[in-house]
C-alpha cells in the first residue's frame, strides 16, 4: 500500500506492507530520487535489567550513488563517522518516546538504497524510522517528525535542500512530536563568500590573505524564532503521519515491566538513612562514582530487618531516595548537591602551553571536570579525506576535533578502545562550536585532540573552552573566543528549575541535557536531549538566557587567561605561500612526480600545489629549509626554456655539454649559485661544488656545462 504525503515543502511517498514484512515495522520511503528502507525488529523476551536496550543503525549503501566501495574490500564494512552520527541523531530523537517499563531488545535499521544529492538524507531517514516505529506493535503515542531550518539572506528556510544549505548561515536540526521538542542540533555556518586571497602581482612571491569572515552566531531570540518555525512544521508533520498511518498501526500486545515497589524498604530507608544519603550525595557531587551508596547498602543488608531483602532491591530503593532528595532540594530550596545556586558555574582554572613540544595546549579545569586539549598544525596532506555518499570526489576536512574519554577519568579500570558513538558525538559537537571561529583562509590544517582527564559532567563543553584557548596557544588567529556550558532541567509537579553547568549527578537524575556554545555575541552550536517526553518554548527560552549568563562568565575568565598566552614559535611549523605561473606547476611536479619528490627529500619540507591558481605552499620546521626550497622552485619555473609549445622562455638549444663560459654570478641561494652564461641564460653551480669559494653576486667565474636536463643547465667550475 502506498501513501503520498505533501508536508513541509516535501513530497514523501511511503510503501507499507510491501517489503521486510517479517519485521515488527517496515516502510520504504521515497523523496525525490532518494529511497530509504527503515525497519524495526524486537526480541520476544525482556532483559532483566531496567533500561531500554535500543540499537539504531544507519547504513549508506554505495550502490545508492552508483559507486563501488573503495579500498581492498569491495563491500560496506564498519560504519563511517557520518553514518554513526546520523544513527545517533535518530536514536536521540526516538528514545524518549519509548514507554517506561519497555525492556525488549530492539533494533532500528535505516538503509539508504538510492541517494539524491539534493535530498537531506538525515531528515528523511529519521522520518522513515519514525513511521516504521509507529507502525510496529511497540506502543507509541504519536509519530516523531524531524525538520531542518536554514537561514539565507537573513530569512529562515524550512527544510533547505543540500544545495540551499551550502548558502545557509544556519544548520538547525529539530525533532519532536506534536507540539513538544525532543532533540535539537544547531550550528552556525560562517560566511564563505566574502573571504578572498589577494595576489599583489600576476605571480607574486607572497600571497596576501585577508578575511571579512562572519561567524554568524545566532542570538537567543533568533534561535527561539527558528525553533518556533520548526515546532509548527513538526506539529504539521506529526499530525500528517498519524492521520495517514494510525489505521495501519499494529495492536500492541506487549507487556511492560511494572516498576517493583518495596514500600517497607522505602519507609525504612527514609526514616533511618536520609542523613547518610544526603552526605553520600555531597560526596557523589565530587565524583561520578556511586561507591558511597554501595557502602550504605552493605550497612543496611547487615541489619536483622534486611535478612529477606535482596541487594538489588535495596540498591534500587536507595537510588530512588537519592533521586528524590536531589530533586526536592533543587526545587524547594534552590540548592544543589555541591552547595551551588541554580545559575552558578563551578570554579575554573586554566593553564596554557603546558606541553613544551606540542604546537598549542590548554589544561581546562571546571570543578571536577578536566580536559587537556592539544592543537596541532599541519599541511594539506594532513587533512582528513572523507568519502561522502552524495559527493563524486572525497572532500578534504581541514579542521578536526577528536575527543577521548578514558575510563580513569571517572575512576574506572576499563580498557582504552577505539572511539565509540559518544566520543564521536562529543567531538563533533565541539567541532561545530569552534569551526566558525577559525578563519577559512588559514593555510594550516588544524587537529584538536581533547583528552578528558577527569569527568563529572559537561566534558564536551570543557573541550570547547579548552579547544578555543589551545588554538590561541598555537598562534591560530581565531576570530573570537568560544565557550560552552551544559544546562540541566528538573521538572516535577508543574514546578521546574533550570541548572547551569550541570555535574554528572544532575545529568543522571535530571530531565534534560542542553549544551550551548558560542561567543559573547551569540551561539555557534547547541545540542539538546530531553528525557521527560518534550519541552515547551518558555522553559527553553529560560534555559537559553541562563546559558548566556554562564557562557559570558566563562568567557571573561578565558579572556584573562588568553592575555597570558606565550606562543612557542620554536615548535610551530613554518609556511611559505607564493604563486607561480599555473602552467609551470607541471615542471615543479616533474615526470611521475620525480622533481617534487626530490625537492621534498632534499630540503625536508612538505609541498602543496594548486594547479588552477598556481599557488605553492611549502611547510617545514626550519625557515632556512623553506627558503631554500622556494628558491629552488623559482629557479625551476624561471629556467624552463623551450620545454613547452608557445613558451616565451629563451632558447637553450644552442648549448652543449662541455661548453665553457666566463659567467657572472647573478644570484646566490643556499643550494648553489645561478651563473649567467650568455643571452640571459643561467646555469646552476651546486653548493657542493663551490664550498671552498666565498662567492658574491656579480663575481666572474669560468664554468663549463655538466648537464642539460628538462630545460635546466647545471655547470661545474673549470679546472
Curated annotation (Swiss-Prot):
GO terms for biological process: mRNA catabolic process; RNA processing. Its EC number is 2.7.7.8. Its cofactor is Mg(2+). It is found in: Cytoplasm. The keyword Magnesium applies. One of its GO terms (cellular component) is cytosol. Gene3D superfamilies: GHMP Kinase, N-terminal domain, K Homology domain, type 1, Nucleic acid-binding proteins. This is Polyribonucleotide nucleotidyltransferase. The gene is pnp.
